[in-house]
């Protein structure tokens, strides 16, 4: 059986290869996954290091190749390769994470958590909860099913999913022209 990664692509050919299949208009930089460290990004083509003020849109807050992450790579691989539907199927890794998060990261006045796979989904779920709450309150007051508008920053990035894209400032109207506008 052939591996998905049988063909090696040289760092100098990354953008050309990606451009065959996707819109590859990102940075002129090839991320070196082995040599990048802490807050430093390394360009695989040149070896040049760059101080990272980007952190992959905030998803790499602990930096690159953090020693703790590397030391526990096997556990992270198990969790990543065997992703369960955490709302219905549980495992010890999930219980340990939730327990740690609950003890350290949750204030007593917010006793419950809801976990999703990213910022756009978090924003969308927050919007759904807010719409539901507001419409219910308006129905109780007898003013009907009102409550489907929100206030948001115009020049901000909110995500790349349905609701979030309709709030995200983008220069290409084809990306959102048939989405409801908030």
What are these regions (language model features)?
Residues 1-109:
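N-terminal glycine-rich, Lys/His-bearing helix-loop that initiates the first secondary-structure elements
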Residues 99-182:
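PLP-dependent aspartate aminotransferase-fold enzymes
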């Amino acid at each position: 059986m052939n591996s998905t990664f049988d063909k090696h692509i040289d760092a100098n050919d990354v953008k050309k290869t990606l451009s065959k299949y996707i819109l590859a208009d990102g940075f002129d930089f090839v991320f070196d996954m082995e040599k990048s460290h802490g807050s430093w990004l390394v360009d695989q083509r040149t070896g040049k290091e760059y101080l990272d003020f980007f952190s992959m849109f905030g998803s790499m807050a602990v930096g690159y190749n953090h020693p703790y992450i590397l030391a526990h790579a096997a556990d992270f691989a198990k969790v990543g390769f065997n992703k369960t539907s955490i709302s219905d199927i549980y495992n010890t890794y999930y219980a340990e994470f939730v327990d740690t998060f609950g003890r350290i990261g949750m204030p007593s006045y917010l006793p419950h958590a809801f976990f999703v796979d990213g910022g756009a989904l978090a924003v969308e779920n927050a919007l759904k909860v807010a719409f539901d709450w507001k419409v219910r309150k308006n129905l109780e007051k007898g003013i009907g099913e009102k409550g489907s508008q929100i206030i948001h920053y115009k020049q901000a990035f909110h995500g790349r999913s349905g609701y979030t894209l309709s709030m995200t400032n983008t220069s290409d109207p084809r990306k959102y022209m048939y989405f409801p506008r908030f």
